[in-house]
Amino acid sequence: TSTLSWLDEITMEELERNPY
């Protein structure tokens, strides 16, 4: 789940910037 940690953070940031 360590990999998901940074992935989740990046996804959250991307969603905040470009909410599809």
Swiss-Prot record:
The keyword Acetylation does not apply. Induction: By 2-ethoxyphenol. Its EC number is 1.14.-.-. One of its GO terms (molecular function) is monooxygenase activity. Keywords: Heme, Iron, Metal-binding, Monooxygenase, Oxidoreductase. Its cofactor is heme. The keyword Ribonucleoprotein does not apply. Belongs to the cytochrome P450 family. P450-RRI catalyzes the O-dealkylation of 2-ethoxyphenol and 2-methoxyphenol to produce catechol. The cytochrome binds other ortho-substituted phenols, including 2-ethoxyphenol, 2-methylphenol and 2-chlorophenol. This is Cytochrome P450-RR1.
